[in-house]
């Protein structure tokens, strides 16, 4: 695995828009404020031509223009790290115009984004053996003040941090809108982790069935392996395409084992279950050590009696590995910045989780 150099003091932050740009509110104002904040921290900025573009369908510009920008700015020596302007809908089409051979031959560079940016963070790992950060997009850094998760992501980029923890509360409903573009996360809900582990011979009950451990004092759990994953909506879309080298990646790193992280955006509970089934049957979960599952955007919803827990656990039970759910990953902020492709140790103590990156 190739790990990029950290963002140096007085370095240059590059911004690209392979998915949505920051063309409309509240993202436009938030992105402008993010630039002010990074400039105040001493950094120079290198904005790609699509950062404010609104010419595409589901992305900032045409797939050709987006792919060209992403390749050029990743391989450029004019910036030290890249942050994606935002998520979106059709970044998969951008991938057809990204030169992965050129990226693989270039000096590795930290790329950060989430949601639709799974198309890049996942493929950087599986195609290029290059680590990236599944974390906040550029406009989020415009909030006043920064949430702790934004500081974590920034310090991870700078090399000032090699571990992340869960946060006390999460945002069920955002207050940010066109008239209030710089509001911080509206964290109102206490984080309550759900911990499912295979039953052993000494715990009673049917051996091998998943049981839920209380996220309370006295409960401890540790996992170690290589992180891989992203937004399920995007992951299952890549499955079976020419970009799908996931099974080969898992085989290449089988001695480490894979810790999958997953979260869902548009998918309802049935959609999540179908996607998990497809990934499982495609062999993606070979050499798996465990699963880190973020709160789905459709949190708390049921679909014909199926909830978010059974949508995942029923199908993954036979893999006989721990499944940690309702984590700070994904679309219901805040989110722990995760190093895609990174080797990590996950430690759970009660309702607390810590991820230590062991190779940074």
For each feature predicted by the language model, list its residue ranges.
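ATP/NTP phosphate-donor binding region
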Residues: 1-78
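Buried hydrophobic positions in well-ordered alpha/beta secondary-structure cores of metabolic enzymes
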Residues: 15, 82, 116, 235, ...
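Long, hydrophobic/aromatic-enriched structural stretches that serve as scaffold segments
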Residues: 75-98
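Structural motif
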Residues: 81-83, 112, 259-261, 292
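Short, acidic/small-residue loops that bind anionic groups at enzyme active sites
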Residues: 98-124, 131-139, 319-322
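Conserved anion/nucleotide-ligand pocket segment
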Residues: 133-233
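Oxyanion-binding "anion nests"
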Residues: 226-265, 269
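C-terminal active-site/capping subdomain that shapes the small-molecule cofactor and substrate pocket
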Residues: 269-360
């Amino acid at each position: 695995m190739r790990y990029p150099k950290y963002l140096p003091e007085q370095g240059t932050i590059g911004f690209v828009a392979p998915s949505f740009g920051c063309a409309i509110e509240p993202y436009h104002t938030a992105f402008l404020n993010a630039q002010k904040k990074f400039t105040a921290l001493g950094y120079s900025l290198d904005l790609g031509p699509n950062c404010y573009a609104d010419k595409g369908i589901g992305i900032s510009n045409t797939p050709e223009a987006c792919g060209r920008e992403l390749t050029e700015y990743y391989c450029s020596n004019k910036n030290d790290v890249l942050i994606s302007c935002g998520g979106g809908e059709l970044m998969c089409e951008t991938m057809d115009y990204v030169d992965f051979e050129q990226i693989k031959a270039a000096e590795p560079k930290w790329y950060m984004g989430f949601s639709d940016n799974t198309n890049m963070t996942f493929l950087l790992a599986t195609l290029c053996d290059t680590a990236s950060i599944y974390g906040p997009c550029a406009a989020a850094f415009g909030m006043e003040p920064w949430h702790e998760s934004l500081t974590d992501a920034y310090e991870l980029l700078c090399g000032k941090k090699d571990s992340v923890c869960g946060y006390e509360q999460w945002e069920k409903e955002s207050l940010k809108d066109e008239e209030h573009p710089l509001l911080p996360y509206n964290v109102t809900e206490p984080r309550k982790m759900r911990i499912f582990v295979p039953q052993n011979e000494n715990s009673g009950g049917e051996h091998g069935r998943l049981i839920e451990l209380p996220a309370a004092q006295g409960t401890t759990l540790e996992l170690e392996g290589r992180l891989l994953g992203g937004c399920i909506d995007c992951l299952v879309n890549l499955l079976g395409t020419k970009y799908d080298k996931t099974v080969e990646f898992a085989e290449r790193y089988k001695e480490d084992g894979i810790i999958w992280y997953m979260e869902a955006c548009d998918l309802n509970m049935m959609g999540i279950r179908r996607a998990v089934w497809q990934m499982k049957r495609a062999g993606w979960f070979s050499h798996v050590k465990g699963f880190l599952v973020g709160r789905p955007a459709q949190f708390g919803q049921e679909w014909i009696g199926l909830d978010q827990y059974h949508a995942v656990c029923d199908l993954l039970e036979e893999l006989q590995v721990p499944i940690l759910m309702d984590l700070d990953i994904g679309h219901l902020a805040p989110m722990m910045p995760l190093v895609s492709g990174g080797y990590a140790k996950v430690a759970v103590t009660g309702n607390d989780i810590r991820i230590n990156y062991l190779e940074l």
